[in-house]
Amino acid sequence: MSLHVTLRFTVALAAGLLFGFGLALSEMINPIRVLSFLNVASGHWNPSLLFVLGSALAVAFPGMALQRRLKRPLLDECFHLPSKKVIDRRIVFGSAIFGTGWGLTGLCPGPAIASLSTGLGPVLLFVAAMAAGMIIHDRIVVRCLS
């Protein structure tokens, strides 16, 4: 394995470990914590997860500024940036479905996968159903649009 490939795997491993640890430490893997953050209207809103958002922005903004100055990333051939900038029906509908699921369960993909470490049955079922939903999307929606 080349040094370049080893570095890419090492960076991916370190980023994944940091992300998973941060999800657990911030309690993003706790659906009750997430639902209390999303529960703005009840008078029992818990804004603590705003620190997660703030930390992401504190890293992303300088990273985006650096990206604009670089010709290519250090460990890849090019930057993989979204090219679609139009908000269409698919984005709106998909966002509504995602938001409904997140609001009902308090879990979204990253925290759900990190929650697998708990070994809890409902989390295992949620992740399996989430994967099934993605497979159904790929088999039906992507094929219809192709």
From Swiss-Prot:
Induction comment: Repressed by BigR.
InterPro entries, per the entry: DUF6691
Entries under Pfam families matching the protein: DUF6691 (PF20398)
Membrane topology: Multi-pass membrane protein
Transmembrane spans: 9-29, 46-66, 91-111, 116-136
Subcellular location field: Cell inner membrane
Principal subcellular localisation of the protein: membrane
Top-rank taxon, per record: Bacteria
Keywords: Cell inner membrane, Cell membrane, Membrane, Transmembrane, Transmembrane helix, Transport
GO cellular component, one term: plasma membrane
Misc note: Part of an operon that comprises bigR, blh, XF_0764 and XF_0766.
Protein family: Belongs to the TsuA/YedE (TC 9.B.102) family.
Identification of the protein by name: Probable transporter XF_0765
Organism whose genome encodes this protein: Xylella fastidiosa (strain 9a5c)
